[in-house]
């Protein structure tokens, strides 16, 4: 049996020899996957808006061919959005409404249309890839100069227009004050707010547009409103009874200045809170119907001078009381920038350059950005009449130093033939 181990040895050596002929490959590391190339998000094109005022263009845009002609011109100039004003301060409407009277008469002009003014603008603008913001004045109700408008023909509004506290005439209804641009309804009244919300909701529901701009969404001035309804609302706001109203707020001096009363600062705070709370209601109504519609608001850039109108378009982060003697520490809580998508900053100033010059467009935009504090977008806006010869520079500053541009109004752009200059300003800003 000695041959058995020999055979086993033979096979063992054979197997070893076979294994030794194999090439042993070293393990290679897993290759690193290539880094994915993520395309950069394109920078959104800034909005460049041209305003079509209802009153100034009432006769011109009574013809469809005029509308399409100027939409073409706006597009070729570089605008990508228009603002269609559908309710001027007279208070009637250029859209189909169950709440407002159709606007057929303005000054000495009578126009009746058998077509929908707003719908035509929307359709033709969208054909040209122009976005549309619809603008409406909010608390306006007629013209004191001519006693024309809803406040004068409908006794529903008797006692609901603002009661002014004036230096020379005492308490008077704003309807009888021919120095005022419009007979304002009293913003504090629930029935007034509900009425305005109804026509806003109607607009948003029945028409498809891209933005809604609040205009004249404010008090008419520091003389209004001193009605019993406002006195009661103010007493509820501060939790105290007023013994001497309106002297508790201020007394007019013979030179037109004011002698401040006990509740002077709280009064401005209260009125701004009325407007702030109404803007919040508007936002809720709009977003409930069409969440994508952008809420916009136009106001003058000189915010320190319009507290008498109840317009605190700043962020709640900005404390006015540290800079202005008229502001309470709580005034900042009335800021409504955070309720807006876009603030249309009214830099309607003749000077363009000068970051340290409070009378310049550059300063107005920079201040707005500082006190809005990122709560919403800020667009620089221009009054074309102020820039007959230098609108290119004004357009350039607004577009390069803010998040968008609005030019008011097409009537001046037409009158002074500013199309080419505006286009040059847009192109200069977009070449940066």
Language-model segments: what does each one mean?
Residues 14-43:
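Bacterial Sec-dependent N-terminal signal peptides
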Residues 41-61, 134-206, 253-264:
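Active-site-adjacent "subsite" loops/lids of carbohydrate-active enzymes
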Residues 65-92, 206-210, 333-345, 401-405:
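Catalytic domains of carbohydrate-active enzymes, especially glycoside hydrolases
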Residues 79-113:
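Aromatic-lined carbohydrate-binding/catalytic grooves of carbohydrate-active enzymes
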Residues 94-106, 140-176, 216-255, 308-319:
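Aromatic- and acidic-residue-enriched segments that line the glycan-binding/catalytic groove
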Residues 131-139, 213-220, 264-325, 375-387:
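Aromatic-lined carbohydrate-recognition surfaces of secreted/lumenal glycan-active proteins
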Residues 141-144, 222, 289, 293-353, ...:
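Substrate-binding cleft/loops of secretory-pathway carbohydrate-active enzymes
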Residues 326-432:
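Substrate-binding cleft of secreted/luminal carbohydrate-active enzymes
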């Amino acid at each position: 049996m000695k041959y058995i181990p020999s055979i086993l040895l033979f096979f063992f050596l054979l197997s070893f020899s076979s294994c030794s002929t194999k090439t042993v490959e070293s393990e290679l590391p897993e290759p690193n996957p290539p880094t994915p190339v993520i395309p950069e998000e394109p920078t959104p094109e800034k909005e460049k808006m041209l305003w079509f005022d209802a009153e100034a263009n009432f006769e011109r845009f009574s013809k469809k061919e005029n509308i399409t002609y100027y939409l073409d011109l706006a597009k070729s100039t570089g605008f990508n959005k228009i603002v269609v004003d559908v309710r001027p301060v007279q208070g009637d409407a250029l859209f189909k409404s169950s709440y407002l009277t159709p606007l057929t008469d303005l000054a000495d002009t009578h126009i009746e249309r058998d077509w929908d003014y707003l719908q035509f603008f929307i359709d033709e603008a969208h054909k040209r890839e122009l976005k549309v913001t619809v603008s409406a004045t909010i608390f306006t109700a007629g013209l004191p100069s001519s006693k024309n408008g809803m406040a004068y023909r409908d006794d529903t509004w008797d006692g609901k227009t603002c009661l002014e506290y004036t230096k020379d005439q005492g308490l008077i209804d704003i309807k009888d004050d021919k120095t005022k641009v419009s007979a304002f309804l009293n913003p504090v009244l629930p029935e007034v707010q509900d009425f305005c919300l109804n026509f806003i909701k109607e607009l948003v529901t029945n028409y498809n547009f891209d933005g809604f701009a609040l205009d004249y969404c404010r008090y008419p001035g520091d003389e209004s409103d001193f009605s019993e309804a406002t006195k009661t609302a103010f007493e509820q706001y501060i939790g105290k009874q007023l013994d001497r109203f309106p002297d508790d707020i201020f007394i007019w001096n013979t030179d037109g200045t004011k002698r401040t009363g006990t509740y002077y600062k709280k009064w401005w705070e209260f009125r701004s809170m009325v407007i702030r709370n109404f803007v919040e209601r508007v936002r809720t109504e709009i977003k409930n119907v069409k969440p994508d519609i952008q809420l916009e608001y136009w106001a003058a850039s000189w915010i320190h001078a319009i507290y008498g109108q109840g317009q605190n378009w700043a962020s709640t982060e900005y404390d006015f009381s540290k800079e202005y003697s008229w502001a309470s520490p709580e005034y900042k809580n009335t800021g409504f920038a955070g309720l807006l998508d876009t603030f249309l900053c009214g830099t309607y100033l003749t000077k363009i350059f000068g970051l340290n010059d409070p009378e310049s467009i550059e300063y107005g935009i920079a201040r707005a950005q500082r006190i809005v504090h990122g709560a919403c977008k800020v667009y620089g806006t221009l009054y074309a009449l102020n820039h007959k010869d230098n609108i290119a520079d004004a357009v350039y500053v607004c577009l390069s130093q803010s998040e968008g541009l609005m030019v008011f109004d097409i009537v001046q752009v037409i009158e002074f033939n500013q199309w080419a200059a505006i286009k040059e300003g847009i192109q200069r800003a977009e070449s940066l």
